[in-house]
Structure formats: structure tokens, C-alpha cells
Amino acid sequence: MVIGNRVLLPLTKRYYNARYRKVLHPELREEIIAHNCYCEEVNSKLHFDDEKIDPGISLKTAVPSYDKHVMLISDINRGMAKKPGVWKNIWESRIENNTTHPYDIISKLNFGPGVLFNAISITSSLESFAPTSLEFYDFLVMPDMRYYRVKKPDIEKFSQYINSGHAVAPKLSFSDYLSGKAAATTVSNNNQITLSLDDSIYYRELKNDAWLFVCGHEKRDMRCGIMGPEILHSVNTANSKPLVNNTGIISHIGGHKFAGNILIYKPIENQNGRKKVDSLWFGKVTPFNVSEIVQSVNEGVIIENNFRGGLSL
């Protein structure tokens, strides 16, 4: 299975994270009824039968194989103000088909197959970000835990820096991967020299705090477009204080039939001076169970019912 240009791998021991205790959540009758009713409500807004959510479908344990995640920040001002989001009105089914800023730079980003790429719209954060400017392109990068601000002439330099240690990706379409014509694998390029950035590219270290992203790519899949904002609203309002300080909507991360889908990045203690971040993927998430899923992660517990898989980056 693939998403974008990433191979989805079954959950194996390589991706099992021993830092978490995995538990099966016993589903109470009231919870099952609430879940089914919510799915029916979402289905009533969908036009085609093949879009309908099946609440009884089994969740597959599969995650993308990657070791770096580059996220293009979309329209910071509007996202942070919680006005109608770019994920609803601006993001085309294929993000690269957008010709306006900042998406016009995507064709210039030639990342290796070990690099996952998405667009995001930040909805809340303890971080401060510069206002959207046509002169710059803004990125979050995991596990670097950095915010980068790059001018257009420096995009190639930025790509080379991100690609340090990776083979350059071939130019392939999403349909190539769906049809099996191409196989994307994580490749380490032993001849690649690790590059450093000069002063022409601004970056800032992020606070050592978790991030939560919810797929809300409406023009790619209406299910996520409906559920994503509702799930985020629940995360931010279910308790007296937010369960996660940094949240956003993310473009296509696969598994639409398992909507809603969330991705949590949780920093862990540095090992040998190197930053480490846990990447945790969950599916079949609704506004009714997301708080428990996130709270459990905060406490070092993974609810296995909703766990798609994870990696330590």
C-alpha cells in the first residue's frame, strides 16, 4: 500500500516502540452507539456510497517508511485565526496542482524517498511564526524540531540540506505508485555528504513539545474534510486546558477509509546529543475518542484499537 510517494509497511518489530504500553480499550455499548451515530451523521453529508465510513472495518497496522518529515506551512495568519481553512478552500486534491504561493514551490522540492512531504495549516501553537509573505516559504521539519524560513532562490540549497544522507527521489506521479509501476524505498546514500546551512536560510529550534496533526484534506477526501476540523475542535475544547499545545490540519496521509486520521509527534529525551521524536499514527478517530487517545499518549500508553503504527525518528 502507498500514500503519495511512500510505501506503507506492516507494523513490525522494527517499528514497535517499547516506550509505550499498548492496551486494548474495552468498547462500552454507549461508546459504540455514539461512534456509529457519528459515522451515520458524516455519511449523510457524503454523496457516493464508496465514500461512506464503515464503523466496523478493521484498522490496518501500516505506517509510511520515512525518517524525515517536511511540512510546508500554509497561510499562517488565517490558520492561526481559525477562519475558514486553506484545507477546505485552497488545497486541491493534489497539493502540487496549486499554483499560488506557497504551493508554487513544490515542483522545486526534490526530496529523497526517505523524506515525507505534506502541507499543513497550523490552528494553534505556543510557537510564534512570521506572517505569511510572498517572499518566503515556511516549513516545519521533524525530527529536526525546527521551523525554517526560506527565500525562493535558496530552495534548492534547502532541498540539498534536507536530502543529506538520502538518494534524490525520481520524478514520479502518485498514479505511478498506485499502479505499482514504481516502488519507493528508503535509501541511504553513503556517498552523500551531510550539509550544513549558512546564514541565508533562517531556522529556529522549536520548543520541546508535542505536535498533533489531523488529516482534513477535503478535496482529496470529503470524509477527512468533514471530520478533521471537528476532531481538532474536540482536542482543543474537551478539557480545561488543551491536551496538545501545537495542532494543525495536514494534507493527505492515507487511510481515508479509516477516517479520521491523526499523527502525533512526541519529542523524547535526546540520545547521544541527537534529537529523537516519536511518530505515532492513529485511525478511526472521532471527536468522541480523540481526547482519550491523546491523553493516553501523554501518559505513555497507546490505545491499540486505533493505532496504525509508529516510528522513532
UniProtKB/Swiss-Prot annotation:
Give the CC-aspect GO terms: mitochondrial intermembrane space; mitochondrial matrix
Which domain of life does the UniProt lineage start with? Eukaryota
GO terms classed as biological process: cell redox homeostasis; protein-containing complex assembly
Q: Which regions form coiled coils?
A: none
Give the Pfam families listed for this entry.
Suc_Fer-like (PF06999)
Against Gene3D superfamilies, the record matches this protein to:
Glutaredoxin (3.40.30.10)
Which CDD domains is this protein grouped with? TRX_Fd_Sucrase
> InterPro entries per the record?
Aim32/Apd1-like (IPR009737), Thioredoxin-like_sf (IPR036249)
- Family, as annotated: Belongs to the AIM32 family.
Please state what the protein is called: Altered inheritance of mitochondria protein 32
Q: Which organism is it from?
A: Candida glabrata (strain ATCC 2001 / BCRC 20586 / JCM 3761 / NBRC 0622 / NRRL Y-65 / CBS 138)
